[in-house]
Amino acid sequence: MLLIDIASTSLNVGGTSSRLAKVARIAEPLRAAAPDPELVAIVVAWLSGELRQRQIGVGWATLRSPPAAAGSPALTVTGTDAAFSEIGAVSGKGSAARRRELITRLFAASTETEQAFLVRLLSGELRQGALAGIMVDAVARAAEVPATAVQRAAMLGGDLPTVAAACLAAGSSGAAGALDSFTLRVGRPIGPMLAQSAGSITDALERHGGATIFEAKLDGARVQIHRTGDEVTVYTRSLDDVTARLPEVVQATLALPVSDLVADGEAIALQPDGRPHRFQVTASRFGRSVNVAAAQAKQPLSVFFSDILHRDGRDLLDAPTTDRLAALDAVVPARHRVDRLTTADAAAATDFLRATLAAGHEGVMAKSPTAPYLAGRRGAGWLKVKPVHTLDLVVLAVEWGSGRRRGKLSNIPLGARDAATGEFVMLGKTFKSMTDAMLDWQTARFTELAVGGTDGYVVALRPEQVVEVAFDGVQASSRYPGGLALRFARVVRYRDDKGPADADTIDTVRALY
């Protein structure tokens, strides 16, 4: 299978807003790839906007100026995937130059359509509307099995490309059996359950219909912990094995009175007074090049267990939250458990939220006592409640959209005002929470503000439009000149009542950090 086949499919998928059409268009290359499990896994990953290698060390600076495109397509899917692996394996002195050389070679062999696809894939900007649910439906359609069976297998297998490869390789007669082979297995990570957002404590209580389990929401790193006998493995939220980097988590798990275990938890760096360090301090312990012994001595991590999915031969995924927490409390000491309160009283829950925030944490999780653990899914059984920060920032440029946003000026780079120079300092970009009406309005508005026309993918703007942006926090970032970036930024509204001189300053942002 050629790379152009997948690049063209991506274009076709992005060109329709119909869910059924997206599913049908993705199913076609999956059927064609079915005899080759490796090829299926690559196609599923790519059309989901992901690399199988996850990260290969290629950023925007490398992708910004690709070489002249090839005249005709010749690259294969497996050959391109192998090139990604080669690029990702480069390390040591001169590695940046070597990666640029390899990526330039790959792009020189790509047509314009293929180059556009590769840029979006490598930059994480492949927004064609093929979200996980659509990909599950496409795999189910290609394999002629129920989507619920694919979803369940992906939940337990922890990886949709692997599940799709096994399912499609088995053929129509063996696909169902292949899916049934994916069960909870200690040592094999599964997708973590995710939370929906609630607007307030009262909202969470109303949605859960009464008594709710409130837990402190720590601003650490999600970990999934597996133990079989004396062997412990630790995985990140994205299912990367980080066991060797987190000896504290391993030691705490080995101290538990269990033989085998699968648990959900949080690793976090705490200050001497028990308050959390900034998230970046915790995140620094997860780097691939970290000297673990030195890092542990400088900044040890603490681990807090919040859920248990398997214990000593008993699977607990389908058990209600109360049963899972009882199993957790029976083996995990209080010092390693997340603080929690079960109540139907809004005042008591609000006091718990305030105390949690005062302790330096993000907010609270509200969990339904009867909810099962929906691995890999964002269920209403878990709700997150946390304060929302907003800033008034200036739109510095805008990018043309894809998928349902095709033909609209969409993704906006955001800048805070530097009071000393009058310039604007970029803090990231977003298209989150933009309605269709907002996209229509800003396409017209930004066309008026465009500097040098609107033909390019990125359209430069006069820095005049102020936008109110909500975000979850500020983090350190080497990607932007100011050294800071907003976490999970989304648009609230455009502020036509404000000019660029009214925008928040970079000093205000630094104070939030």
From Swiss-Prot:
Q: What is its EC number?
A: 6.5.1.1
Does Nucleus appear among the keywords?
no
Gene3D superfamilies in alphabetical order: DNA ligase, ATP-dependent, N-terminal domain (1.10.3260.10), DNA ligase/mRNA capping enzyme (3.30.470.30), Nucleic acid-binding proteins (2.40.50.140)
Q: What class of enzyme is it?
A: ligase
Which cofactor(s) does the record list?
Mg(2+)
Q: Which SUPFAM superfamilies match?
A: ATP-dependent DNA ligase DNA-binding domain, DNA ligase/mRNA capping enzyme, catalytic domain, Nucleic acid-binding proteins
Q: Which GO terms describe its biological process?
A: cell division; DNA biosynthetic process; DNA recombination; DNA repair; DNA replication
Report which reactions are catalysed by this protein: ATP + (deoxyribonucleotide)n-3'-hydroxyl + 5'-phospho-(deoxyribonucleotide)m = (deoxyribonucleotide)n+m + AMP + diphosphate
* An MF annotation (GO) of this entry: DNA binding
Q: Give the family this protein belongs to, as stated in its UniProt record.
A: Belongs to the ATP-dependent DNA ligase family.
Q: What does the protein in this record do?
A: DNA ligase that seals nicks in double-stranded DNA during DNA replication, DNA recombination and DNA repair.
Task: Please identify the protein, giving its name as recorded.
Answer: Probable DNA ligase
Gene that this sequence comes from:
lig
